[in-house]
C-alpha cells in the first residue's frame, strides 16, 4: 500500500497540565501490518509482524498518560443497553447491538429522523465476490453535515465534559507519576516480508481508494507508548461519545489519516464529544503492565488479520465503503474545525473576563490601599492626641506639689499684706494727727503775726511821739523841770519799746524754730507714707500675680475654688 498514516501526539502543557503517566520505563509496540477494517470477517494471520520493544524515550513531552484501569476500560467497553440508545439533537443516532457471545461482535446501527436505519454488521456488509449486492440503504450514503452530530449536540456543560468518558481528565490517575517519554508514533510502517506476497494484488488500486481503505485502520501504523499507557489519540478516537462502535472508530482513524498529525489539544477536544452527560462505564482493574501489553498485542494481531482480509477483498467492496467513510471523514473534519473555532472564541471570552476581573480587583485593591492609608493617618493623629493628653496628665500630676507650695506662699503673703495694711492705718492716723497739729500751728502763726503787726504799729506810734517830744524839747529849753519829767517818761517808753521788740524777736525766733520742726516732721510723715504706699502697691502687684498663677493652676487641674476676693477676706479675718 502506498499511503501511510501517522499520528503525532504533541502534548500541549496548557491544556494537559493534569495528565500523568508511569515514570521511568516505556514500552514500544511496533506493528508491521496493513490497513484494518473491523467490518470484515476474521481470518488466520501469522504473528510474525508483532513484537514488543521496551526502551526509554529521550525527552519527555507528555504530562500524563493512561492508567491501567482506564486502558482496560477502553479495550473492554461493555455498556448497558439503556445507555447506548442515545439520540442526537440533529436527528441522527447510533445504537450498539449487543450479542450474547463473549467476543466483541457488537455493531452499530445508524438511525435517521424517519426511523430508517442502516446496520453495520457482518450480515450487512458485502460478501466476497458479491460487491454489487451491498446491503447498505440509501440513507447510509448521505453526507449531511448538520444531520450528523451537530455542534450544538456536541457542546456540553463543563461539569458534563469533566465526567465525559473520552476526556483526558478522567483517564489520568492521581497517584500516577509523570511521564518520562513522549508518545512517538512512527511516521511510516513497512510491511512484513511475509506480507509482501499478499500485497501484490493491491497495486492496481487507485490512490484515493487506497487512502480510503487505509483510513479504516483502527489502530494506525506502528507506534510507541510509555509503559503502562496507550496513546491518548488512540483512546479518544476509539471512544468518542462513549457508545460508538468499530465503524465510528474507523471513521475517526479516517479523519486522523486525512489530517496527518493531530495535537493533543485536538484529541482533548474530540474526547469531549459526548452526546449526553451519562456517567462513564465501570472500569476494570488491570493486574500489571505486561497484561496490558499482552492484550494490546492480541488486539493488534486481530486487526492485522482483518487488514489482510480487507486487502484481499478490496477490489470487491471498496466502492460503498469509500463513499460512506469519505463523507463521514469530511463531516468529522468540518466539525473539528468548528470545534476549534468555538473553543478559540470561548478562550477569548474567558481571557476578556479574566482581564475585566483583574482590573476590578486592581481597582478594589487601590481603594483598599487608600482606605488603609486614611485609617493609618487617623490612627497616627489619635496616637498624637493620646500622647498630648498623657503629657498634660503628667504635668498636672507634677503641678500638685507646686500648687501646695503656691498656696502656702499666698497665705504668707496675705499675712504680710494684712500687717502692712495695719501699719498703713496707724501711719494714716499719725498723719492725721500731725496734720491737726500743723493746722493749729498755722493758727498760732497767724495770731503771732497779727500781734507782731500791732506791736510794730505801737512802736511806730511811740517813735513818732518820741520824735515829736524831742522836737518840742529843742524848741523850749526854758522849762527844765517839766523836761526832766518828760525825759523820764521817754526813757521809760524806750525801755518798754525795747522790751517789746525783744519779745517780738523772741516770738519770731520761736515761731521759726517751730516752723522748721513742723516742716521736718511733715517731710518725715510724707516720706514714710510714700514708702508705705510703694510697698503696698508692690505687695498688691505680687498678690495679683500669685492669684493669676493660682487661677491658672486651678484651671489646669480642673479644681474649682472660691473667688480671690472672698479668699483674701477670709485670710484677713
Curated annotation (Swiss-Prot):
Disrupted gene: phenotype observed: Morpholino knockdown severely impairs cranial nerve development, with shorter or missing cranial ganglia and reduced nerve arborization. Neural crest migration is impaired, although neural crest induction is not significantly affected. Brain size is reduced and cranial cartilage development is severely disrupted, leading to smaller head size. Eyes are smaller and deformed, with coloboma formation and disrupted retinal lamination. In eye, expression of the genes rax, pax6 and otx2 is reduced. In brain, expression of the genes emx1, pax6, otx2, en2 and egr2 is reduced.
GO biological process, one term: nervous system development
Keyword Coiled coil carried by entry: yes
The UniProt record lists the keyword Coiled coil: yes
Extent of Basic and acidic residues compositional bias: 125-135
Job of this protein: Plays a role in axon and dendrite arborization during cranial nerve development. Also important for neural crest migration and early development of other anterior structures including eye, brain and cranial cartilage.
Protein name stated in the entry: NEDD4-binding protein 3-B
